[in-house]
């Protein structure tokens, strides 16, 4: 298996969490959160990340309702994914992200209690969980 680099995005209207992962280790690391204004990110910041990490794949979390149906944020996340593809020519995959924010808060709380629960950290760890879910679904046993 080639070492593939994956960038993960947890799309939000005010903040977009970003993580980087390696397929060979099936693990990911939180990078940062990018501020967004009504879902519109700072594209220059994203361009720098794409240039720096040269991802083979970009995984964008897809916020679905618990019953699997789509909502307004699902459509906005898809639009964000499509724009990433159009602007940077990167291969895109969307990944079900139900419960990632809850799981991210639990993971951060284990590491540092309430002090660790800043919005930016939660978003970046959510992006980690999106990448890890992708790896598990595509390369797990």
UniProtKB/Swiss-Prot annotation:
Compartments (UniProt record):
Cytoplasm
Provide the GO MF annotations for this entry.
nuclease activity
Record-listed E.C. numbers: 3.1.-.-
* Alphabetical UniProt keywords: Cytoplasm, Hydrolase, Nuclease, Ribosome biogenesis
The record's GO CC annotations read:
cytoplasm
**EC main group:** hydrolase
InterPro entries of this UniProt entry?
RNaseH-like_sf, YqgF, YqgF/RNaseH-like_dom, YqgF/RNaseH-like_dom_sf
Primary location group: cytoplasm
Q: Which domain of life is it from?
A: Bacteria
Swiss-Prot/TrEMBL GO biological process terms:
rRNA 5'-end processing
Q: Name one Pfam family in it.
A: RuvX
- List cystine links: none
Q: What does this protein do?
A: Could be a nuclease involved in processing of the 5'-end of pre-16S rRNA.
Please give the PANTHER family that the UniProt record associates with this protein. Answer: POLYNUCLEOTIDYL TRANSFERASE, RIBONUCLEASE H-LIKE SUPERFAMILY PROTEIN
What family does the Swiss-Prot or TrEMBL record give for this protein?
Belongs to the YqgF nuclease family.
| Name of this chain's protein | Putative pre-16S rRNA nuclease
Organism this protein belongs to? Shewanella oneidensis (strain ATCC 700550 / JCM 31522 / CIP 106686 / LMG 19005 / NCIMB 14063 / MR-1)
């Amino acid at each position: 298996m080639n070492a593939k680099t994956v960038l993960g995005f947890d799309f939000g209207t005010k903040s977009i969490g970003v993580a980087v992962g390696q397929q060979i280790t099936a693990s990911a690391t939180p990078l940062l959160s990018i501020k967004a204004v009504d879902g519109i990110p700072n594209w220059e910041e994203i361009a720098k990340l794409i240039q720096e990490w040269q991802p083979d794949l970009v995984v964008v979390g897809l916020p679905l309702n618990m019953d699997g149906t789509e909502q307004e944020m699902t459509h906005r996340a898809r639009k964000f994914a499509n724009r990433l593809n159009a602007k940077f020519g990167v291969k895109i995959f969307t990944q079900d992200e139900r419960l990632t924010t809850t799981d991210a808060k639990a993971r951060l709380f284990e590491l540092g209690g309430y002090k660790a629960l800043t919005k930016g950290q939660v978003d970046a760890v959510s992006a980690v969980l999106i990448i890890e879910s992708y790896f598990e679904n595509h390369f797990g046993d």
